[in-house]
Amino acid sequence: YRHIWLGEPVADSELSVIKPKWIDAAIDSHIKLGFEASGQRILGFDVADEGDDASATILRHGSVVIDMDEWRGQDVIYSADKVYLYGQDVKADKIIFDSIGVGAGVKAQFRRKTGKVQTIGFNAGGSVFKPEARYTDDKKNKDMFSNIKAQAWWMVRERFYKTWRAI
């Protein structure tokens, strides 16, 4: 029922990449582990068009998520402007945005901006980062991941898992 009607993922399946209990453990984990947020303030932005999908942002300060937002029903230009202004307001060091598909319009809109927030496109189908680097003793990154999206999601998974283990 919860999966079909409420949209909850089948969380404890062997096929789930990130377990909900790992996400729960990450909430305020920096406090539990005794460190403060530090480092760059990075705003991630996934844009959607005017359909049912949601646009979303996540603001992190170093490894600590400090804000999230989502909205629906707005065009790409509205969303790009909203995110850029928010990035300026929170003094983000950079905005990393989905730059393919609908995100191509974001790239064009960000180019028109004259503010100081750096904007970086993320091409999910792009090449693996540091393909020759060792992922494990017997595998290189290029042998483990098919593209940067798979690699990035696995990095997120590893952060959640390691945080859960630390807590």
Question: Regions from the language model: what does each represent?
Answer:
Residues 56-62:
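Short conserved beta-strand segments at catalytic cores or DNA/RNA-binding microdomains
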Residues 2-3, 55, 81, 154:
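Active-site-proximal helix/loop capping residues that flank conserved catalytic or ligand/cofactor
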Residues 1-45, 59:
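ATPase catalytic-site recognition across NTP-hydrolyzing enzymes
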Residues 63-167:
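Mg2+-dependent endonuclease catalytic cores in nucleic-acid-processing enzymes, primarily RNase H-like
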Residues 47-50, 76:
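A general structural motif
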